[in-house]
Amino acid sequence: MLPINHSEVLVSNYPLEDNSKTIYTPDKKALLQVIDFNNVIDVGILNHFINNNSLDFMEMDTTSHNFFYARKYPNDNRLVPIVKHFEKCEKIFDSVIETILQTKDLVGDKSFTFFNELVLDTLSNIESSGINTVDGMKYSQYNIYTSTGRPSNRFGGVNYAAMSKEDGTRKKIVSRFEDGKMLMFDYDAYHLRLIAKLINYNFPNNISVHEYLGKQYFGKDKLTEEEYGKSKEVSFRLLYGGIDKEFENIPFFKNVKRYIFELWANYKNDGYIESAIAGKKLYFNNVEGINPQKIFNYMIQLYETEQNMIVSEKVFEFLSRLRTRFIMYTYDSFLFDVYSPEMPLVLKKIKEILECNNDFPVRSYTGSSYDDIKLINT
């Protein structure tokens, strides 16, 4: 246990700061917010790899923890006696030691390294950036231990992964810089393009994916605005609800259907499938009603996460020399708090990084708050 700020303990220096030993922790992201250790293993990720669920430490709170937490005092952990924190830590240790011993061989696996280092470090960096609001600086908290591997993002009663455009909450998110701007990028037809990568299908570059598929849905050379909108709905339904017979002869969906059943065959034969980039083994231990379509949906959401983390790491490398901050990532979009003099460079360079040599085109939006961002031509 490493006390950070508690009246009952005085610590002048911390052991392990020389990074000479491997550190196991229930929450690597939280630890990195306080001390930037190297050689940190996240036990939550180890558990997620073998059980596909999250560790729950709520039941390990002592009576003292429950007393202070229920009253919602500011800085409540400073009020809990240090011996009670130690008691809770002992309970946590007892609960995770078996996981640590069971997964010793997994620690060196490249797929584990991808999530333990690239994914968690990247999400920790986003969290550290903070989200400036009219009420002061707020912070997000990404949960990677979901059944699909796609992070959720909520903290302090706010679901940052699903902020409404109607209730005014987005208006509160503004730049921390004087005359600063919010800048957002989102991918065009992201899942369709990710799937095309998986099945080696090339969409034409001179037409939108939704228009390209819509022409085949409706058998027309030119779509109305209404048909273009319906094209998006049809694609979504076919991808996540199953491919109807009337669309099976469309080349893209014919290949998608073949890929889905290849995934299913691999799962039935091996007992798992491997994620597209990191090669993480997905066993679906705790997934009810597993079927070919559900496996495909899980595969795509995890592929999305892996791809997003790779480009996000590159974005942080670029921003390391600038004042602009990467403050939020939500499935197919990325939000930045931009220092105005850096806007031209940031807009150009981050667009290049996200698009990956035009494989995944993005749209760009800017405004004075997250609520009033408008599409811009780039």
Segment roles from a protein language model:
Residues 114-118, 126, 130-133:
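Non-catalytic, peripheral interaction segments enriched in hydrophobic/basic residues
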